[in-house]
Amino acid sequence: MASYPYGQGYHGAAGQPPGAPQTNYYGGQQYGGGVQPAASYGRPAPGAPYGSPPSGGVYGHPVPGSAAPGAPGGPYGGQAPGGPYSVPGSTPYGSQQHGSYGQGAPAGNIPPGVDPEAFSWFQTVDTDHSGYISLKELKQALVNTNWSSFNDETCTMMMNMFDKSNSGRIDMFGFSALWRFIQQWRNLFQQYDRDRSGSINQGELHQALCQMGYQLSPQFVQIVMSRYAQRSAQPGLQLDRFIQICTQLQSMTEAFREKDTGQIGTAKLSYEDFITMTTTRLL
């Protein structure tokens, strides 16, 4: 499994399709920045949210101290009161704990390039005080709107993307990059959850992918929902699955673009090329 230090080495970085957040996460380097793909499977729709969320965020909660309007809001779970994104109680990620969230640490103790809120959360999530975040600690820290923990696949995917040292742990700089990555996805998730149910249904997912620029059929979206949505009377995707689907779709689209030399939406490749492509691009 490949490692993507702070998201810099992620395969989509050479030219991502619409869908993933484009934000400078660490050291001025852009996660997934680059040229746009051809119109056949990736040109952003007019007015699409690709690149940055709307000014002030969906619920008007920009990050305190953020440099510009439109930055993602606070940790997932700290949304506007009253709706499906309200916080029902305390949680490792999404509410105040031990006075950490919102208070931060003395400015002089925050390393350059580290988000102050991410720094504060790092102190809380690093339960063993090792100076690193393990997969277990990360999973314990992240929750969805329905109070479920992030699934193992999404947590492992994000660890692989932001683990600089291939040690299975994330340092403070990697965590700051990961924190911003999640906030951007959270903002998009809220934007596409048009009925404010706290989850993404099949119609919302199809609309989201279309507005991100992906030309995919309703049948494909149905397959995705049957694979990843919760089993219930009203199947829906929580934030963790939404991040997983969109990030993997971005990676696979970039792999296809490398074979689609004419940028026409079709490519010819051998069976081994196909297997290699799918194996190496799964995060």
Swiss-Prot record:
Single GO MF annotation: calcium-dependent protein binding
Main location group: cytoplasm
GO CC field: COPII vesicle coat; Cul3-RING ubiquitin ligase complex; endoplasmic reticulum
Alphabetical UniProt keywords: Calcium, Cytoplasm, Cytoplasmic vesicle, Endoplasmic reticulum, Membrane, Metal-binding, Repeat
Comp. bias regions, Low complexity: 37-70, 93-104
Sequence repeats mapped onto the chain: 21-30, 36-44, 45-54, 55-62, 71-79, 80-87, 88-95, 96-104
8 X 9 AA approximate tandem repeat of [AP]-P-G-G-P-Y-G-G-P-P: region residues: 21-104
Gene3D superfamilies in the record: EF-hand
Protein task: Calcium-binding protein that acts as an adapter that bridges unrelated proteins or stabilizes weak protein-protein complexes in response to calcium. Acts as a negative regulator of ER-Golgi transport.
Annotated organism of origin: Xenopus laevis
PANTHER family associated with the record: PEFLIN (PTHR46212:SF10)
Membrane topology: Peripheral membrane protein
Subunit record text: Heterodimer; heterodimerizes (via the EF-hand 5) with pdcd6.
CDD domains in the record: EFh_PEF_peflin
SMART domains in alphabetical order: EFh
Pfam families, alphabetized: EF-hand_6, EF-hand_7
Positions with a binding annotation for Ca(2+) 1: D126, D128, S130, Y132, E137
GO biological process, one term: endoplasmic reticulum to Golgi vesicle-mediated transport
InterPro entries named among the record's database cross-references: EF-hand-dom_pair, EF_Hand_1_Ca_BS, EF_hand_dom, Peflin/Sorcin_CaBP
Region (Disordered): 37-113
Name this polypeptide is given: Peflin
Phylogenetic placement of the source organism: Eukaryota, Metazoa, Chordata, Craniata, Vertebrata
Residues noted as binding Ca(2+) 2 in the record, renumbered to the chain: D193, D195, S197, S199, E204
Superkingdom of source: Eukaryota
UniProt-annotated location(s): Cytoplasm; Endoplasmic reticulum; Membrane; Cytoplasmic vesicle, COPII-coated vesicle membrane
